[in-house]
Amino acid sequence: MTLDLDALDRALDALPNLFRGPGGVAGVVKDGQVVASRAWGYADLTRRRPMETATRLPICSISKQFTCGVLLDTLGDTAAYDARVAEFLPQFEGPLPTLRQLCDNQSGLRDYWALTVLQGAEATQTFRREDALPLIARMKTGHFPPGTAYSYCNCNFRIVSEILESETGRALPDLYAERIFGPAGMRTAELTSDTRHPADEVVGYEGSDAVGFFPADNGIFWIGDAGISASLQDMLAYESWIDATRDDENSIYRRISVPPAYVCGTPASYGFGLSHETVAGVKVTGHGGALRGFRAQRFHAADERLSVMVIFNHEASAHAAASSLLAAALGHEAPKGARPEGWAGQWLDPESGLLLRVGEDAEGLTLRFATGPDRLTLGEDGVPRGAGVSLARDGAMLVMNRTSDNLTVRAEPLPVVTVADAGEIAGRYHARELEADLVIEARDGGAYAGFEGLLGEGPMERLHPVGPDVWIVTTRRSMDAPAPGDWTLQVRREGGAVTGLRLGCWLARRIDYARV
């Protein structure tokens, strides 16, 4: 396969303008050799410190594959340690996930960073290492049986890291360095778990080109699920190492990139900290990463021996940027879809309790269900398709097939409500699942929700009606990124009287609150 280097150069030149922000880095590896390496903008605007290819940046959740790689390289068969999962979930009432299901995001556990919102956290407060396990230990149920579906869950990898350190008797930073950083030639990569002290004093920025950029104030401690800082030089060395070991079936990357599957045998889209998807017409493994003020994305196309890496110190889409580089290098043009008609609307999934909203534009559809929006284009057969998702209609119902999640949803139409009296739902509610409270206040047409729990009393969040007895709670900033976004809140009644609520987002579904 021959790269279109001219097109790749043009795509690289376009990144600072297309994905506007303080700075970024991007690089490409082909056949084990670095063919492009760029750094632009500033690692700190105020101090005028330029971004460089040697500047270490948080790679965030890309760290998950390193955790899984070390796990396989040190402990081997994960099944031998399945019994240890119970130690971290002492109140869990259903079947427990296996260690492999944790690594594959098939545990069914709710994401602990999403739950920090419901436990009363404020986005910038300190979250210590010792704060995580008590929060996880409160879990009593999951949102699906282990091994049957996919849901992104950071605490899966926190549990994995705790087991890994306990079984080896060694600290995770040392294991990363011995098993991956050293062999791969990642000379400056290290685990920087405390986000208050970023490597090389790099500054991440919230905001946008429309409103301006301001330094992100992060205070979380993460390990196993994220936490590695690495320069572009380090990450390109990692990609070269992957290529150099491609023919060794016992190499770490070969082992973590085996095709995953669900317990029913259906192929899965995520395994051992790697996403399996098709980008620019080719199969890739990779992962994204996010922390407030930072975004990262890597892709590796094994058959093409091609890798792409992008990191921003702002919140533009690194996934879109990396995809554009892959498409340029391969000469891939995405097919244009027909203009959709009659798809716009909103529906409610009775199983998950989540809202589905579909918007139309000239180029396709925007589906809002998971943490981020899905873009779908209309094929010649009239079926809207996106990455791992398609839509169909069955009368008034909307059928969403998320092959990437092993999930089919038959959602019922939800009439639009834009004005509702929140007075009857105002009050205090308690969630047994979380051992935490929700307070709703209503005044002069406005409604707000506040969460109280293990981590304190969080800020009041906006509450907006969207349908009969259905509201959304809007969370735009949280400890981790991206934030949960819109939570769907359903009102539960008995004899017309409000008795409770059901709250959920894609990361944390079906949480019941009883009126106090």
From Swiss-Prot:
Instruction: Report keywords, A-Z.
Output: Aminopeptidase, Hydrolase, Protease
Q: Detail which positions bind substrate.
A: D480
Keyword Hydrolase belongs to the record: yes
Residues at the catalytic site: S61 (nucleophile), K64 (proton donor/acceptor)
Matching entries from Pfam families are given as: Beta-lactamase, DAP_B
| Activity modulation | Inhibited by beta-lactam compounds such as 6-aminopenicillic acid, 7-aminocephalosporanic acid, benzylpenicillin and ampicillin. Inhibited by p-chloromercuribenzoate.
Q: Which domain of life is it from?
A: Bacteria
A GO molecular function term, named singly, is: aminopeptidase activity
- Important for specificity: annotated span: 476-486
What is said about its interaction partners and assembly? Answer: Homodimer.
Q: Which family does it belong to?
A: Belongs to the peptidase S12 family.
Task: Specify the protein name.
Answer: D-aminopeptidase
The record lists the organism as Cereibacter sphaeroides (strain KD131 / KCTC 12085)
